[in-house]
Swiss-Prot record:
Alphabetically ordered keywords of this record: Methyltransferase, S-adenosyl-L-methionine, Transferase
Source organism: Mycobacterium avium (strain 104)
Tagged with keyword Plastid: no
Name of the featured protein: Uncharacterized tRNA/rRNA methyltransferase MAV_0574
Chain sites annotated for binding S-adenosyl-L-methionine: G261, I281, L290
């Protein structure tokens, strides 16, 4: 259009007109004749996909436990009274002392735990701005035993008495069961590596110090470990309200593994299938079930009674 001829770039300069697109004249196509179909990307040496395929596989990240920090005057004091292993006690500068803080500092000093005074802002950062009341206790990760260590702990003594926990999720139940195992002559506790409560400061505190004496082991595959123990001569006894026998008929004289199911679902299907016997606890009245740690304590007490008799 004549009206647009003044627009910059509207009129092509002489000698700048593009010519027809020029191809290879079929040379590239003829050069590929007889070579077959194009190989997949991962088989072409210079293709990024081939380089990725030839590189060594990435190793999965190693799962490590994290240091735990206990916050607050009552929780910290309870941990120190229970002998929970700790590496450092942090106290915020300017914190008003009371009997709990004074006793915590005294117990930490007697136990050889480092006592560090830090600015309150630093303690806020360390604790993620959670309520700490001016005091925090650093607890290192628990060192778990190997399942074979539990068998070694039971060797050369009365018949083995071990407890396996099938996905117990409450650390207080774990701690209470560890305490019952210690009280009734058990040799160790086995937990799954995944989907299970860990030996945290809460579990340690609930065990009333028994976690220092009773080894807790982790199994990568709980069912497989129970099968291995059964092959080594241990009877696997599951606890369930719908058991095929009652506690009154249980013979506790053999080497035993007592398996306690999770708080809500009880024994998982595979674990139940690998039990030699499933035992229920007879109860009076309308009570339908017991807490997992209470049920474990009842059974362990009965086994201990039989072995004493």
């Amino acid at each position: 259009m004549a009206g647009n001829s003044r627009r910059r770039g509207a009129v092509r300069k002489a000698g700048t007109k593009k010519g027809p697109t020029v191809g290879s004249g079929g040379q590239r196509r003829r050069g590929l004749e007889g070579r077959g179909p194009t190989p997949p990307a991962h088989l072409r040496p210079n293709h990024p996909a081939a380089k990725r395929a030839q590189s060594p596989p990435r190793r999965p990240a190693k799962r490590t436990e994290e240091t735990e920090t206990v916050l607050g005057r009552n929780p910290v004091l309870e941990c120190l009274r229970a002998g929970v292993p700790a590496t450092a006690l942090y106290v915020a500068l300017g914190t008003e002392a009371d009997e709990r803080l004074t006793e915590s500092v005294s117990r930490a000093a007697d136990s050889g735990i480092s006592i560090l005074e830090v600015p309150r802002a630093d303690l806020d950062r360390m604790t993620g701005n959670h309520l700490h009341q001016g005091i925090a206790l650093q607890v290192p990760p628990y060192i778990y035993a190997h399942p074979d260590d539990l068998l070694e702990a039971a060797a050369g003594s009365p018949p083995a008495l071990l407890v396996a926990l099938d996905n117990i999720s409450d650390p207080r139940n774990l701690g209470a069961i560890v305490r019952s195992v210690a009280a009734f002559g058990g040799h160790g506790v086995l937990i799954p590596q995944r989907r299970s409560a860990s030996v945290t400061a809460v579990a340690w505190r609930t065990s009333a110090g028994a976690a220092a004496r009773i080894p807790v082991a982790r199994a990568t595959n709980l069912t497989r470990t129970l099968q291995d123990w059964a092959d080594r001569g241990l009877r696997v006894i599951g606890l369930d309200a719908g058991g095929d026998t009652t506690l009154d008929d249980l013979d506790g004289s053999d080497p035993l593994v007592v398996v306690v199911g999770s708080e809500g679902k009880g024994l998982s299907r595979l674990v139940r299938q690998n039990c030699d016997e499933v035992v229920s606890i007879p109860m009076a009245g309308s009570a339908e079930s017991l807490n997992a740690s209470v049920a474990a304590g009842v059974v362990l007490a009965e086994i201990s009674r039989q072995r004493r008799g």
